[in-house]
């Protein structure tokens, strides 16, 4: 199954995630993150209490809505997902990554329903967890596998940013 093979490489999926740090630079500038231990704690806190947690909840809800073919609720949840980040920069990150994922998945692993779903999604503003949830649901990837891959990608991108910023070595 293509998705199962790709889960281990999910953090490298072509969404431009390497260009974003989810606010890690600001955390460094404010002295919150200054090395390996504080980076791990920062990532843990983000997973438990930050936007990745909100993303995981939204991913699960969108997944289940898509499985039920409830496109009216999908439209409402997709619009709600645009409002869940606490900072406009995080929303922008999620939109750029979501749109990139949606374009890549539509061309590399198409599904007959993707075209009709387009009218229920915010035009050019598909946040990342929404795009992942729809693709996973339509291709019958288990929701738990999808959630784990999504969150693993967040952590891997955070570690990559930590290396780039000199917080940890390679």
Which positions does each model-derived feature cover?
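Internal, conserved structured core segments that host functional sites
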Residues: 56, 61, 65-137
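A short glycine/serine-rich beta->alpha loop
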Residues: 4-14, 43-49, 83-90, 117-123, ...
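Electropositive phosphate-/nucleotide-binding environments in soluble metabolic enzymes
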Residues: 17, 33, 37, 53, ...
């Amino acid at each position: 199954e293509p998705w199962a093979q790709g889960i281990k490489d999910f953090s490298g999926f072509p969404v431009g995630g390497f260009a974003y740090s989810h606010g890690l630079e600001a955390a460094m500038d404010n002295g919150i993150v200054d090395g390996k231990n504080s980076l791990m704690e920062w990532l843990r806190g983000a997973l438990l209490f930050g936007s990745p947690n909100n993303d995981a909840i939204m991913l699960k809800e969108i997944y289940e809505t898509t499985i039920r073919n409830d496109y009216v609720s999908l439209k409402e949840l997709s619009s709600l997902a645009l409002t869940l980040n606490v900072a406009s920069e995080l929303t922008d990150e999620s939109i750029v990554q979501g749109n990139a994922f949606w374009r890549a998945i539509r061309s590399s692993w198409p599904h007959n329903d993707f075209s009709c779903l387009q009218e229920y999604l915010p035009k050019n503003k598909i946040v990342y967890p929404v795009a992942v949830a729809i693709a996973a649901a339509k291709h019958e990837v288990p929701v738990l596998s999808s959630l784990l891959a999504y969150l693993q990608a967040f952590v891997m991108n955070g570690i990559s940013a930590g290396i780039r910023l000199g917080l940890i070595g390679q």
